[in-house]
């Protein structure tokens, strides 16, 4: 029986994201050339009406402020009847206010929280307690020191060619991404594929989803459905 992997977009709609992209002329970052499934995808996914979700702020949830600290309290979370853990952003972050929503590298665990191995172990331990793990995903914008800044065309610009923060917001610590740039959109989906395969994450809660074009989400869903053993 094929596994059902669902990716939840909180308060907007449910989406699924997996895609392998063309990397020609892309800015340099920590991306690998090929991904392999780590661990075993969860087969028994609860129905939407059965979900009991718990959001975890890694910095605040444990004294260590990291993945290991949260892992040590998984039994406490499970006792609440939780069957899905939503981790606030775990990717490397930057910017002047150290916000976890200012991503500087989509392919790296922030050193403050641990390593890829720590994340893999955390997810495996959650799965052993019948809890899924979804990652907060920040698709709309990045930190100003993100690796993608090597190509300014990946970002929204004003009439003078200056990269800008998201329009209509006071989020000046982040730069708005340009979803008209196909290379950027492809790389974004590729990064989401990385965590699903290399860490066995169960999905994503997508931040500021309504700022991102629906066409991007639709293309991402279609890409996911082509991946074997995940639907």
Predicted regions and their residues:
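Bacterial Sec-dependent N-terminal signal peptides
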Residues: 17-42
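Short catalytic-loop micro-motif centered on adjacent basic/acidic residues
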Residues: 134, 203-209
């Amino acid at each position: 029986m094929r596994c059902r992997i669902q990716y939840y977009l909180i308060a907007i709609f449910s989406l699924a994201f997996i895609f392998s992209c063309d990397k020609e002329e892309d800015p340099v970052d920590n991306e690998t050339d090929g991904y392999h499934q780590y661990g075993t995808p969860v087969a028994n996914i609860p129905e939407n009406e059965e979900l009991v979700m718990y959001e975890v702020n890694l910095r605040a949830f444990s004294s260590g402020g990291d993945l290991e600290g949260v892992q040590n309290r998984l039994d406490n979370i499970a006792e609440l009847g939780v069957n899905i853990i939503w981790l606030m952003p775990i990717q490397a972050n930057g910017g002047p206010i150290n916000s976890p929503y200012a991503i500087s590298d989509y392919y790296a665990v922030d050193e403050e929280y641990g390593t890829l191995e720590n994340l893999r172990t955390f997810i495996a331990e959650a799965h052993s307690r019948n809890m899924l793990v979804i990652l907060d995903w920040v698709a709309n914008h990045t930190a100003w020191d993100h690796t993608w800044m090597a190509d300014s065309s990946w970002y929204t610009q004003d009439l003078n060619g200056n990269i800008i923060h998201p329009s209509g917001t006071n989020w000046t610590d982040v730069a708005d991404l340009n979803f008209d740039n196909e290379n950027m959109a492809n790389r974004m989906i590729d990064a989401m594929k990385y965590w699903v395969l290399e860490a066995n994450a169960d999905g994503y809660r997508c931040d500021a989803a309504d700022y991102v074009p629906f066409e991007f989400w639709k293309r991402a869903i279609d890409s996911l459905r082509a991946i074997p053993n995940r639907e």
